[in-house]
């Protein structure tokens, strides 16, 4: 245990043009995302973000909270989103929700914002 605690994991730099993976998570009070790269079969953390909900954001439906986590990551990690293909890994049908013709309001605006990046979705 002492050895593990005395050697914290290091953040790994990304390589130009490589595919990066984004894990998004939602709780009752916050959203978070971890941007990782695959290096020889092991994943290395590049960046981690989290953001607490403010005001009415707590009342978003679960799928909107997940989309909010993705757009928050895109805002904070814009240089990575511009330079790399981002593969979003989630257990929810986020791609279908973002590209649905019934998507209105925030979801439609976020989908338009994300369309400028090379984002792929994998469940």
Question: Where are the regions that the model predicts?
Answer:
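Two-metal-ion RNase H-like nuclease active-site motif
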Residues: 18-27, 70
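Amphipathic alpha-helical
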Residues: 1-12, 117-118, 123
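A glycine-rich phosphate-binding loop feature that marks nucleotide/adenosyl-phosphate handling sites
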Residues: 18-21, 86-94
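A short, polar/acidic, helix/strand-boundary loop motif
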Residues: 41-68, 72, 90-96, 104
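Acidic, metal-ligating active-site segments
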Residues: 28-37
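Metal-dependent nuclease catalytic cores in nucleic-acid-processing enzymes
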Residues: 63-83, 107-118
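Short coil/turn segments at secondary-structure boundaries
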Residues: 12-18
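Amphipathic alpha-helical blocks
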Residues: 27-28, 111
């Amino acid at each position: 245990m002492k050895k593990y605690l005395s050697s914290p994991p290091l953040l790994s730099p990304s390589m130009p043009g490589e595919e990066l993976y984004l894990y998004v998570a939602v709780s009752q009070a916050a959203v978070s995302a971890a941007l990782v790269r695959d290096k020889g079969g092991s994943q290395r953390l590049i960046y981690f973000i989290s953001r607490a909900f403010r005001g009415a954001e707590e009342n978003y439906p679960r799928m909107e909270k997940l989309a909010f986590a993705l757009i928050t990551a895109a805002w904070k990690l814009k240089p990575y989103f511009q330079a790399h293909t981002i593969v979003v890994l989630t257990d929810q049908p986020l791609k279908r929700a973002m590209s649905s013709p019934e998507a209105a309001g925030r979801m439609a605006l976020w989908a338009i914002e994300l369309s400028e990046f090379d984002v792929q979705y994998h469940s």
